[in-house]
């Protein structure tokens, strides 16, 4: 491992240990972490995920059902993104000790696919149209008001590429449209020494996850991915919070796949010789070269968790930057305009509003296949956001700007999460 990366991770570990000792005896939960206030929301959805597009639809959420902590949520959206989802969350197998989550999603999306690396050309892209579905389940063992947790996670899914368009929106013929399926397992945990899991204002949180090796095809590599996420919360003024986030992801190849270009071309090529010699064939060969280069990199180094989208580097498309390693750090100031518990009960919603918030943020991220190259091409985002904190859910709207332009997004939960709907892990 590169000395600079080793030094960096050592400092993260030291900071985590110091945070644990410092906050464990000081930070008290400011409210019950197992919700009891029943709430429901029937709400229109007008969302946007950078690099995937916009969608509208309808969502339903029931929080703290039957006087307990369990939630149900469902959604239906259509537009650039076609998706349907259902989830049962925080079902207590053993009260306040063993918690079960399960969810199902199906989707059809037109993604934007770039070359790997921080310095990849933003104009050199292809647009795969992908459909699929997955069933996701998680068991969480929790202690001490959810301060200490371990989880096991399984995702059973399948997907296929329906078509691939070039940058001029011309479809390539001869694309493999067969279904791929598999089961993916993750193990992880968290140390949450904050005053509240949903809306923390002071303390620190450390999360880790390991996605276990899996491959769907004989020519693919097997590798596992370790993610580390450290977030600190410093109280400012009366209700405000200054938030710091540090994230590192590393893929470790355990069994290398095919790294011969000609062999991969036979399996994943775009059949460019069907086009007559000229611009169309040149465009096809260019797109094919990029596609195969990504396959080669993935087989040699694996793919760590990507940057870009709703969680990190918010001014870039979803999954914009990817490689064998990823490093991210950012800071966000959250102005809490109110600090209240205001009940509301209207025809389509009932619950408790606990805050309205403005935010300003700055982020920097980088990816590379080798540690020595990781700090070579950093990318930055900055912007502002608006949030509404309700009982059991946070709705946020962010505007972000970076080297490749601006993005807006309407999403749920705070940024810098380990998992999200657009990146379920």
PLM regions: where:
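Transmembrane beta-barrel strands of outer-membrane/channel proteins
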Residues: 46-48, 58-60, 72-78, 100-110, ...
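Outer-membrane beta-barrel initiation region
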Residues: 24-103, 151, 175-201, 304-314, ...
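Outer-membrane beta-barrel "beta-signal"
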Residues: 187, 386-392, 406-425
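Transmembrane beta-strand segments of outer-membrane beta-barrel domains in Gram-negative
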Residues: 28, 110-256, 272
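C-terminal outer-membrane beta-barrel translocator/porin domains of Gram-negative envelope proteins
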Residues: 198-351
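Sequence/structural signature of outer-membrane beta-barrel proteins
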Residues: 63-67, 77-83, 107-111, 157-161, ...
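Membrane-embedded beta-strands of outer-membrane beta-barrel proteins
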Residues: 58-60, 74, 86-88, 137-139, ...
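Residue-level signature of outer-membrane beta-barrel architecture
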Residues: 48, 62-64, 90-92, 139-145, ...
């Amino acid at each position: 491992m590169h000395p600079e990366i080793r030094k960096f991770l050592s400092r993260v570990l030291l900071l985590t240990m110091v945070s644990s000792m410092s906050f464990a005896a000081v930070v008290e939960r400011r409210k019950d972490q197992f919700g009891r206030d029943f709430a429901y929301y029937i709400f229109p959805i007008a969302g946007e995920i950078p690099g995937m597009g916009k969608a509208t639809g309808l969502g339903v959420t029931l929080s703290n059902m039957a006087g307990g902590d369990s939630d149900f949520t469902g959604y239906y959206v259509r537009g650039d993104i076609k998706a349907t989802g259902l989830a049962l969350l925080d079902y207590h197998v053993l009260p306040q000790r063993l918690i079960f989550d399960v969810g199902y999603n199906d989707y059809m999306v037109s993604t934007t696919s770039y070359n790997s690396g921080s310095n990849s050309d933003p104009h050199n892209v292809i647009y795969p149209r992908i459909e699929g579905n997955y069933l996701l389940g998680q068991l969480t063992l929790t202690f001490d008001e959810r301060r200490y947790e371990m989880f096991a996670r399984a995702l059973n899914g399948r997907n296929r590429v329906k078509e691939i368009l070039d940058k001029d929106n011309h479809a390539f013929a001869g694309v493999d449209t067969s279904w791929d399926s598999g089961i993916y397992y993750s193990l992880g945990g968290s140390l949450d020494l904050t005053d509240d899991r949903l809306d923390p204002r002071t303390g620190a949180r450390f999360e880790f996850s390991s996605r276990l090796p899996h491959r769907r095809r004989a020519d693919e590599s097997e590798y596992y991915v370790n993610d580390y996420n450290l977030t600190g919360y410093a109280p400012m003024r009366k209700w405000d919070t200054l938030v710091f986030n540090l994230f590192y992801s590393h893929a470790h190849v355990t069994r290398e796949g095919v790294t011969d270009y000609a062999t991969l071309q036979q399996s994943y090529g775009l059949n460019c010789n069907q086009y007559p010699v000229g611009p169309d064939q040149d465009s096809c060969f260019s797109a094919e070269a990029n596609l195969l280069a990504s396959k080669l990199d993935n087989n040699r180094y694996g793919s760590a968790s990507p940057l870009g989208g709703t969680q990190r580097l918010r001014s870039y498309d979803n999954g914009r930057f990817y490689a064998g390693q990823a490093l991210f750090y950012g800071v966000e100031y959250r102005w809490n305009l109110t600090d209240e518990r205001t009940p509301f009960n209207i025809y389509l919603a009932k619950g408790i509003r606990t805050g309205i918030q403005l935010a300003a943020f700055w982020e920097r991220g980088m990816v590379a296949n080798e540690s020595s190259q990781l700090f070579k091409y950093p990318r930055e985002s900055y912007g502002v956001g608006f949030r509404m904190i309700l009982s059991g859910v946070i709705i946020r709207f962010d505007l972000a700007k970076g080297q490749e332009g601006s993005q807006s997004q309407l999403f749920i939960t705070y940024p810098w999460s380990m998992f999200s709907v657009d990146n379920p892990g």
